Amino acid sequence: SGDVTMTVTGDDGREQTQVFPLSVMAGQLSPGQHEFSVAAGIPDDDSDLEGGVFAASYGYGLDGLTLRTGGVFNQDWQGASAGAVLGLGYLGALSADGAYATAKYRDGSRSGNKVKLAWSKQLALTNTGLRVSWSHQSEEYEDMSSFNPAETWLQQNQGRRTRDEWNAGISQPVGGLFSLSASGWQRSYYPASTTGSYRYADDNGKETGVTGTLSTQIKSVSLSLGWSGSRNMNGENTWSASASVSVPFTLFERKYSSSTTVSTGKDGGTGVSTGLSGALNDRFSYGLGGGRDSDGGVSSYLNA
């Protein structure tokens, strides 16, 4: 989606993920309530960005309406967004977001935009969650996660860029024992670029996919099983599956949380990652970990 995701660890050692800010923000604020977030960090080993990243967002609640704005800044990539969440009462909630980003390539800067509309509804009788979303982005919009400032724009544009994406999902708790969720998506692309002026006329196909998750919590231990499958424009299928466990614990009167994920896919490889997070005080938290992906690549991270 192009969002910048940062993990914040609370005093109890549990992790909370915050997204800054280029996505639909579904949470509504009470009238007169303010929400302000600031974060700074260093890109991980999988990123081609250099230098630090600073992110900030602000939200304000009105009667039935939440307004939000935010920005993410790096020396080579800057993005800003604004959005609103409107409560529709019995009909659920509707959100609209827009984002604008500028990426500085080796041969100059390019700017683009994206918009996203989303609807969600929680059925009170069964506690079933429903959601539908649509997003569109211009061809020159560049996600921070895929941006490489060492390349030219043409080099980055050799592959297909997302044009439109539809998502639909449903979630359902079952008897207080576990929760099930399923979603499907369809994505269309701009034609792939081969030179500055020539494009394959038929390289504008669609891809589709589905995902499913089963999650539960046994006392303080969280367990999750996931599966996903997709089909590309050439009719080729792929799939992946994962299992994860998160265990909070206390050591020397400090609270921590450990997490481990095992994943596999169509090609048969197995990936394993593990991490540990904690907090020294109300203002300072940290996380560290590492692992091996299904292709044998090794990675590690450290954040604070």
Feature roles, as predicted:
Residues S1, T9, R14-A39, P43, ...:
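Flexible, glycine-rich linker and terminal segments associated
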Residues L49-G51:
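Short, solvent-exposed loop/turn segments at conserved positions within beta-propeller repeat blades
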Residues V53-A55:
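Edge strands and adjacent loops of beta-rich recognition modules
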Residues L62-G64:
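Glycine- and small/acidic-residue-enriched microsegments that form turns, hinges, and capping elements
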Residues W77-Q78:
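C-terminal catalytic or substrate-handling cores of phosphate/nucleotide-
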